[in-house]
Amino acid sequence: MKEKKLWGGRFDAAPSSLMIRIGESISFDQELYRHDIEGSISHSRMLRRIGILSESEQRKIETGLGQIKKEIDSGKFEFKIENEDIHMSIESRLTELLGDLGKKLHTGRSRNDQVSQDVRLYIKSEMHSILILVYDLLTVWLKKAEAHTKTIIPGYTHLQIAQPIRASHYFLSHFWANVRDFEDFYSAFERADELVLGSGALAGVNYETDREYLRKDLNLARMSENSMDAVSQRDHIFKFLFASSQFMVHASRFCEEIILYTSQEFSYFKLPDHLTTGSSIMPQKKNPDVAELIRGKAGRVIGNLTHLLVMLKGTPLSYNRDFQEDKIPLFDTVKQIKICTEGIRDMVEGIQIFPENATRSLRNGFSTATDLADWLVSAKGIPFRSAHEIVGELVKHCSMKGYDLFTIPSGERGQIHAVLTDPGYEAAISLETSCDKKDVFGGTALPRQKEQIKRAKAKLNELTKKLKQIESKGKKTI
């Protein structure tokens, strides 16, 4: 005899095999079991407070839910496709354990508000883990910057050598981008920190549900304002996926730089062997696979965001079965963000820099041409447009003759313009001087780098406090 569905009273026929296969979500939403049990325990306590359950009944339900958690933890729990999802799987097992008492648990609750609460609890829990990983990455960026305040590397625009920068400036540029990522992930935590239980299917519930008790017991910051909004929106998932997509764009751009800068054509950086792989046919190869894989995963995470946006855009209020698909991109993104953050951290820690190769590229790329033009303006009183033209002629001559600004003979410089033979020429094209002339707030000058590192340390202290707030706001998730 087929097992009757928990919602089957209205139906004469059981769902077809196809309906069961297309409708099941237990193959993926079992990820929520801890949070579903956590919410159910709080719900049972609330039912006791309002007189639906006796104290003895509530204790039995809580004990039963604890046993189910142990069964799932140990791998002994049998997930059945016929039970559709994690909510029905747990309730069905609870009914096996407790008989009709298990059927009382769903009083004053719909799967619509139940799943919405589960996902919020899941996001809160995972945000804590992700924020710790991003924080660790920030400390590595800062440590790398501190070690390379005097190392000069090329800065690029249009993938053409533009101006010299201190390597610390480069590493700090990624530090500040990831600071914003941390803050956006923190904001995603706050968006999920909400009680939606008590919203029912969409209109609320017919019982005197004590939502304030539920909020406190689940350690949530606030209650949802509108039951229809609570069960039909997925902004809490959007918020996380937006933050994740931005993080992965930042990560992918860094990975692209690693791929370029570790190639033979650049050779500014070198990755340690344990973060690279070889070729099955070419024995000389040392491939930056971690960087390439993370770059590829960026498209995957952005695709997860697109998946959810497109899925939701055509659905009327309130709940629709389409929403079952919201968890696949969520779970996958959590997994990808965690492993990619670790990968970026390990690459940053392991990068070896070759300043001599960077210097060669800076010289060959005429990276201080702008500084030379500015020197003609400030020291020699030449109008900027005229100075720009003089230096442009000099660069063209060097390119044709195989010189750079450092190797072209004084006599040949004088053929272009007499001012280029001035003794101040050498200082004007100095790589270090070029960096230190950028003595503005946020610039690459050495004093400004030291200031920026100090501010970065202060920012880390600020983020440390936010991590502690997360720990105090987070539920113990059973």
UniProtKB/Swiss-Prot annotation:
Signal peptide: none annotated. Its EC number is 4.3.2.1. GO terms for molecular function: argininosuccinate lyase activity. Keywords: Amino-acid biosynthesis, Arginine biosynthesis, Cytoplasm, Lyase. It is found in: Cytoplasm. One of its GO terms (cellular component) is cytosol. SUPFAM superfamilies: L-aspartase-like. Its main location: cytoplasm. Pathway: Amino-acid biosynthesis; L-arginine biosynthesis; L-arginine from L-ornithine and carbamoyl phosphate: step 3/3. InterPro entries: Arg_succ_lyase_C, Argininosuccinate_lyase, Fumarase/histidase_N, Fumarate_lyase_CS, Fumarate_lyase_fam, Fumarate_lyase_N, L-Aspartase-like. CDD domains: Argininosuccinate_lyase. GO terms for biological process: arginine biosynthetic process via ornithine; L-arginine biosynthetic process. It catalyses: 2-(N(omega)-L-arginino)succinate = fumarate + L-arginine. Belongs to the lyase 1 family. Argininosuccinate lyase subfamily. This is Argininosuccinate lyase. It comes from Leptospira biflexa serovar Patoc (strain Patoc 1 / ATCC 23582 / Paris).
